Amino acid sequence: MHEAIEPGILSRRVALTVAAAALCSPPAWAASKSEVLTVKHDMQPLQGETESLGLVVLRLLMDKTVASHGPYQFEALPPRDSITQSRSLLELRAGGLDVMASMNSLAREADGIQVRGCLRRGLNGLRLPVCLASRQAELEGIKDMAQARKLSVAQVSHWPDALVLERNAWPVQRIQRLGVFDAMLALGRFDVFLLASDEAFGIVQALPKLVVLKQWLVAYPSTYAFMVNHAKPELAERLRHGWKLTQADGSFEALHDKAVGWQVRQAHLAERRWLILNNPDQPPQALQQDAKLWHPLVRQRLIEPLLKA
């Protein structure tokens, strides 16, 4: 014969059992931290790189947040010969990619969750002119934009930089991919090709018929940052937390200098004439980042005057 149990006593027993089980079970966040997060990307090295700068910085931010967010692994998409930023944006929107690094533009704001923080320190907006070595003496003498606009210039078609030049009344010859610019210079299709100050020497050192001009550069405010798939907000938050940690300990500046500092120093940026352009496609909110993330010259000559205007 079973002993009758009052409903109130039963309810208390059930509550105590549930509470005990909860104490013995790990919390949800602990379970998620023990899982390995897979991050899909397609950050392939550019011409002149051994490893993509974007991937190097992404690894830093992810490593900084292992203690708070758990382990991770990268899954790189198979290498493709004709990958473009436009193709990567399509894959980000479709879920084929979790994260990509790209120059910011108003047109790209809705393509993913924006993670503010320029991983190139604004140096992607300082463009160094590259030309045939046989024409160096002729082209070093450019003094202002009026003279520069008389030169025929080329950019890769899917780079937002091409649109920046066009919106500053500088007609641009668009080429389909970076790998053909040296051959087209040799054929006389255009006078100069503009490369970012943190990549130009790494690319041109393997092209003996070309030189990076020494006397002038084209400058405009520009940020180059991570975008995350809209379905991965937790990854975006993790990267933002990583940025805060690197700003606090200086590890990003050290990593950036190790990766591309030699190219920036070889460019002698302070000694050049800066031909400054507007960038109407630059999202203004992307400029509101920690001052330490900018290269000092970019901050002094481009960003601070713009923010004070």
Can you say where each PLM-predicted feature lies in the sequence?
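A conserved helix-loop-strand patch within extracytoplasmic ligand-binding domains
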Residues: 118-163
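Ligand-binding cleft/hinge of the Venus flytrap
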Residues: 58-75, 141-147, 157-177, 204-208
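Ligand-binding clefts/hinges and TM-proximal coupling segments of bilobed small-molecule sensing domains
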Residues: 156-168, 243-308
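A ligand-binding cleft/hinge motif common to bilobed small-molecule-binding domains
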Residues: 91-93, 100-112, 191-218
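Short helices/loops that flank or line small-molecule/ion binding pockets
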Residues: 78-98, 167, 179-194, 198
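Periplasmic-binding protein-like
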Residues: 43-44, 51, 123-128, 132-135, ...
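N-terminal export signals
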Residues: 2-7, 14-31
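Extracytoplasmic small-molecule ligand-binding "clamshell" domains
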Residues: 32-111, 239
